[in-house]
Amino acid sequence: MDEPTFWTLVESAKAEATPALSNQPEILQKKLEALPPREIVEFDRIFTQLHHAAYRWDLWAAAYIIEGGCSDDGFADFRAGLIGLGRDAYYAALTDPGTLARQPTRGVDFSNEEMLYAARQAYEAVTGEEMPDHGLVHPREPRGERWDHATAAKKYPELVAKFGVR
């Protein structure tokens, strides 16, 4: 599987999901179950690479503003939800996290923990076995510069305007 095919699967599941995107992981899992096991493994590898690439302080600051606080686990869920928004939203946010202010938010929870498990659950449903380890190691620390609450709000005024500071 290549990255364009990965994004086609993610975006088609998003298009079929309810506006809140809460059922997107379930739809994605069903799409993955129609693929050969090696393709499911490759999907998970690409997902993991993208998830790791988004482990950045600037995105964590954006998540903190959007979610009204954001723990380490919450940030993992946020990054999974960011991938679920699709290719354009994902890469725009990596370039400028402030672009997340342009995303529709009515009823949408940016964090989508279940996206983390869609491929693994699909693999288990198809093979009856656990997903093999692809050897990708999560970064020890986020990339970029640390932030505090005041600097995060100043850096992303468009997010503060849309989501407030909670």
Predicted regions and their residues:
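Short runs of predominantly hydrophobic/aromatic residues within well-ordered alpha helices
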Residues: 3-6, 25, 40-47, 71-75, ...
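Long, solvent-exposed, polar/charged low-complexity segments
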Residues: 7, 128-166
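Short coil/turn segments at secondary-structure boundaries
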Residues: 22-26, 58-64, 92-95
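N-terminal leader/targeting peptides and immediately adjacent processing regions
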Residues: 1-39
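Hydrophobic/aromatic-rich, well-ordered segments within soluble, folded domains that form packed cores
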Residues: 64-94, 100
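Hydrophobic/aromatic-lined pockets within catalytic cores
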Residues: 14, 36, 52-55, 83-87, ...
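A glycine-rich, hydrophobic loop/mini-helix early in the fold
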Residues: 29-69
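An exposed acidic His-Trp-rich patch
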Residues: 89-122
